[in-house]
């Protein structure tokens, strides 16, 4: 039987080789040739204190660790991934050659600052969902930063929300442009099923009850009700569930942390928000030697 503590060890989500590939890219981006600052400070062994300077949820520890591991430094933490953290507090230390600490400083801080910001916003919406006793799932989207998606999707997990599909190859989502290019929903779903087979879920973006029913009857497992006002959403979702009980209903489009509670309802299974990875406030950290 799996150790219960493993379900809190978020680092197990990401293979080491994946993290190392990203770390190498980030470090080369920040220092593509000479390290002038490193020449100035030398290579004596020093200890830097990691300070949290704004409240939030800690996320991004595996990336922070991997950056300094690559630079022959040792990181020690006083908090665990997913913990609430307060300003101003010491949450860890980095020990190693001072030039290498400074070489990794900004890259590492960028990672945990952004990851923690996403996790903090995600956690606040998870708490709101529990407050309203809504039993559906809050999810992110593919509205992520090119080259940084693995960190952002990981941070959603730490914050307690669903990542949604990771990329175009993870699930087939047929949006308005797919439908218009194909001619109709039924044909688009049929074409998708032919290549996706039994193991690939199909989701269709719909703008009306009629489109939603067509998508469900064509075999889509998930129907996205896009840009619906809350009352229209709940009415449409109830009717759709009454006719197609097994379909998963997702609400999306224009939903944010201020309006999300209006979309909680017994017939809505998923609410997805782009603002989780686009409209968050990074948590402020600094390293002090």
UniProtKB/Swiss-Prot annotation:
UniProt-annotated binding residues for quinolinate: 106, 142-143, 164-165, 175, 205, 226, 252-254, 274
GO annotations of cellular component type: cytoplasm
Protein name: Nicotinate-nucleotide pyrophosphorylase [carboxylating]
Any matching Pfam family: QRPTase_C
Native organism: Nematostella vectensis
Family, per entry: Belongs to the NadC/ModD family.
One GO-annotated biological process of the protein: quinolinate catabolic process
Gene: qprt
Region (Important for hexamer formation): 12-16
EC number: 2.4.2.19
InterPro entries for this protein: Aldolase_TIM, NadC, NadC/ModD, Nicotinate_pribotase-like_C, Quinolinate_PRibosylTase_N_sf, Quinolinate_PRibosylTrfase_C, Quinolinate_PRibosylTrfase_N
Domain of life: Eukaryota
């Amino acid at each position: 039987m799996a150790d219960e503590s493993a379900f809190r060890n978020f680092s197990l989500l990401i293979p080491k080789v994946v993290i190392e590939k990203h770390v190498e890219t980030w470090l080369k981006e920040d220092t593509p040739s000479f390290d002038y600052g490193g020449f100035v400070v030398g290579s004596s062994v020093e200890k830097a204190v990691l300070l949290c300077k704004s409240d939030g949820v800690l996320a991004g520890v595996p990336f922070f660790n991997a950056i300094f591991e690559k630079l022959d430094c040792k990181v020690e933490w006083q908090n665990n991934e997913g913990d609430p953290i307060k300003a101003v507090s010491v949450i860890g230390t980095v020990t190693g050659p001072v030039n290498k600490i400074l070489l990794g400083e900004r890259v590492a801080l960028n990672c945990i600052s952004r990851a923690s910001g996403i996790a903090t916003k995600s956690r606040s919406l998870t708490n709101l969902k529990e407050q309203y006793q809504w039993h559906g799932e809050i999810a992110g989207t593919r509205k992520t930063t090119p080259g940084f998606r693995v960190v952002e999707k990981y941070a959603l997990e730490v914050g307690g929300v669903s990542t949604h599909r990771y990329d175009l190859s993870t699930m087939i989502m047929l949006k308005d442009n797919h439908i218009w290019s194909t001619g109709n929903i039924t044909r688009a779903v049929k074409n998708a099923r032919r290549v996706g087979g039994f193991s690939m879920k199909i989701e269709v973006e719909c703008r009306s009850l009629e489109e939603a029913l067509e998508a469900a009857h064509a075999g889509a497992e998930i129907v996205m009700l896009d840009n619906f006002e809350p009352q229209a959403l709940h009415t449409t979702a109830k009717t759709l569930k009454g006719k197609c009980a097994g379909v998963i209903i997702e609400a999306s489009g224009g939903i944010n942390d201020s309006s999300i509670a209006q979309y909680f309802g017994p017939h809505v299974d998923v609410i997805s928000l782009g603002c989780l990875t686009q409209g968050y406030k990074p948590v402020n950290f600094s390293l002090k030697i």
